[in-house]
């Protein structure tokens, strides 16, 4: 069974992190649970490395920049990220849901995935996982979660 890092991350996020946030699990028990549901140890390890890099690269700036430079995507980013996902990132930054450092962290984590291409749905999951890991980003996370799962999202002010 060929699985991707994103599939492992989505499974972790859906079954361990979001609904059971109070549940403390060590890496070994998480890995055993993932193996039991059919993920390969290699993909599980890559997913844990992805999460470690996410935790290690938390942005320090908590206030969004106003009227900053426009992000220009380049070579590998253009190849991997479709037009909708790139536009979505710019939209999130313009709306103040992501600041520039968070946007760059989302891009870093998206580029670290083992998929050749990421579509809009994949990008939304990456954004959600990054915001989940960001202290002080609760409102942005809630907005993004509503955008993905709920009714019409409320404007974020």
UniProtKB/Swiss-Prot annotation:
InterPro entries: Smg (IPR007456)
Top-level taxonomic group: Bacteria
Pfam families: DUF494 (PF04361)
Family indicated by similarity: Belongs to the Smg family.
NCBIfam families, alphabetized: PRK03430.1
PANTHER family: PROTEIN SMG
The protein's name in its UniProt record: Protein Smg homolog
Native source species: Xylella fastidiosa (strain 9a5c)
Gene name for this UniProt entry: smg
